[in-house]
Amino acid sequence: MSGNLRTRRTVRHSRALGIALTPKAEKYMERRPYGPGQHGRARRKQDSDYAVRLKEKQRLRAQYNIREAQMRRYFEEAKRTAGLTGENLVELLEQRLDALVLRAGFARTIQQARQLVVHRHIMVDGKRVDVPSFRVKEGQMIHVHERSEKMVPFQLAAAGAHQQVLPATPGYLTVEIEKLRATLTRRPKRSEVPVTCEEQLVVEYYAR
């Protein structure tokens, strides 16, 4: 898929969900703050409770770029964990390696973060990890393989180019961007995680 086509699809998906999934999509949405298609400007009819919950689930899924089967597994684990299921769900998703690569500013989008992991540019505590869903534990360090550091995308990242367009680094990550290193210092708290989601609606969707 060409870069332009991928961008158009992402922008269209962002407008349909009502959230910017990439910095580029955010710029498009500032210019066109309404849904896609010829009826995007029209006043929408009231969504059913089911439609509202479904959309919220889709929004959360899209922000982590995961499949439905993966999402359901995370939900089942969140349900078994002590505490509020919705908060647990977001906190578990946030410990994915690709999510933390994005939060650290090594990538500009969750899709790019996933590719960096799959192509074996990312290490955890000195070992290559090529599984985007790898769960990072407290105290583990994420860093770029030394052979990859000279690549243009990582040179841009080390200069802070991605951090300039992403949300501020959350408190559970300590980042040395010029060294392309980040450490998960503690478990993420839902209130700190920079995703747009009413997680209780997601819980209600799966509990139906």
Swiss-Prot record:
Keywords: Ribonucleoprotein, Ribosomal protein, RNA-binding, rRNA-binding. One of its GO terms (molecular function) is rRNA binding. Residues 29-48 are annotated as: Disordered. Residues 95-155 form the S4 RNA-binding domain. Pfam families: Ribosomal_S4, S4. Belongs to the universal ribosomal protein uS4 family. This is Small ribosomal subunit protein uS4. The lineage of its organism: Bacteria, Bacillati, Actinomycetota, Actinomycetes, Micrococcales.
